[in-house]
């Protein structure tokens, strides 16, 4: 049985990856420091003999006994509401955490995939964004701690591939949504649904003309799986190329929820990207991948998940660190 280490295993994406690799017949070792992850996302796996969980901070030395075939490095705060509160930890997990995982991959002769992000493109001046675009990032802006952590992650991953021969993959993840997101993580979809569930007006920043491209989590996980199983070592965008303005997205959520609340507008945060849409030509040509779940279907699944949560979850305040 092949063995895989997944860091950030109790997070939104990490927990779905644990499910996928258990389903594929792997022995999964999950690792998470639980700063932003939630143990409830993986507790259904605890009874399984092919799943182990370690409560550990990957920015510190990592030891895993026995062989490892793959490492997926997904540990990191991913929401602005989190990384603006814990900027140094965000930088450390992107730098030290990646370094530690790469060292382990070198030792175990494992293939390693790192979770990069569309944020490496910053506030892009090229649209849509392909993998050859270098980006437009403010390294000292409030979002810079996340953007630059991920850019460094890509650089050190390429360096380990070039100079140490580590077999590596880099996925650039665009906006993703689905069950197990935190309602209070501040990102657009859970924020809109949470406000609708509580009977509050939906908050749109700026005039709402800024665009995003939302990919349902199952599609994303399939793309990551295909990339890992390929032999391609340069970055690959995985995301949904169907772009929508945040104002129109808020209107879709209102229609879905049947809520009678209104939309209110607030000032746009500093360095908030004005547009975001992946060019997925590389994923289509190399991996035969493209998203298959349309937004209406994915939104319905996600809304039903959030609505099924205990009502005290609907009004939970963002986590304090």
Where is each model-derived feature located?
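C-terminal substrate-binding subdomain of Rossmann-fold SDR/epimerase-dehydratase oxidoreductases
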Residues: 17, 56, 100, 175, ...
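Conserved donor sugar-nucleotide recognition element shared by glycan-biosynthetic enzymes
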Residues: 145, 153, 185, 246, ...
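A short beta-to-alpha transition loop/helix N-cap that caps and shapes the active-site region
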Residues: 37-39, 122-123, 180, 246, ...
């Amino acid at each position: 049985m092949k063995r895989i280490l997944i860091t950030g295993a109790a997070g939104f994406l990490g927990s779905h990856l644990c499910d996928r690799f258990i389903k594929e017949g792997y022995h999964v070792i999950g690792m998470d420091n639980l700063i932003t992850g939630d143990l409830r996302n993986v507790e259904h796996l605890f009874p399984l003999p092919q799943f182990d969980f370690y409560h550990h901070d990957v920015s510190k030395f990592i030891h895993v006994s026995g062989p490892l075939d793959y490492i997926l490095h997904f540990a990191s705060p991913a929401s602005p509401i989190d990384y603006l509160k814990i900027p140094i930890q965000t930088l450390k997990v992107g730098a030290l955490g990646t370094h530690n995982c790469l060292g382990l991959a070198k030792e175990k002769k494992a293939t390693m995939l790192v979770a990069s992000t569309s944020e490496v493109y910053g506030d892009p001046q090229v649209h849509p964004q392909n993998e050859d675009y270098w980006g437009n990032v403010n390294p000292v802006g409030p979002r810079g701690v996340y953007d630059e952590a991920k850019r460094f992650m890509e650089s050190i991953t390429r360096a380990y591939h070039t100079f140490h021969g580590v077999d590596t993959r880099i996925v650039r993840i665009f906006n993703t949504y689905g069950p197990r997101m935190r309602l209070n993580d501040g990102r657009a979809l859970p924020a809109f649904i949470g406000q609708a569930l509580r009977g509050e007006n939906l908050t749109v920043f700026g005039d709402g003309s800024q665009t995003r491209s939302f990919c349902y989590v199952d599609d994303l996980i399939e793309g990551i799986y295909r990339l890992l199983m390929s032999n391609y070592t340069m970055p690959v965008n995985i995301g949904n190329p169907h772009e929508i303005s945040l104002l129109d997205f808020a209107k879709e959520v209102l229609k879905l929820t049947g809520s009678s609340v209104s939309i209110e507008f607030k000032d746009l945060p500093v360095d908030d990207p004005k547009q975001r849409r992946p060019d997925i030509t590389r994923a289509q040509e190399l991996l035969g991948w493209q998203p298959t779940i349309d937004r209406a279907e994915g939104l319905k699944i996600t809304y039903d998940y959030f609505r099924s949560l205990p009502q005290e979850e609907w009004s939970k305040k963002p986590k304090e660190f």
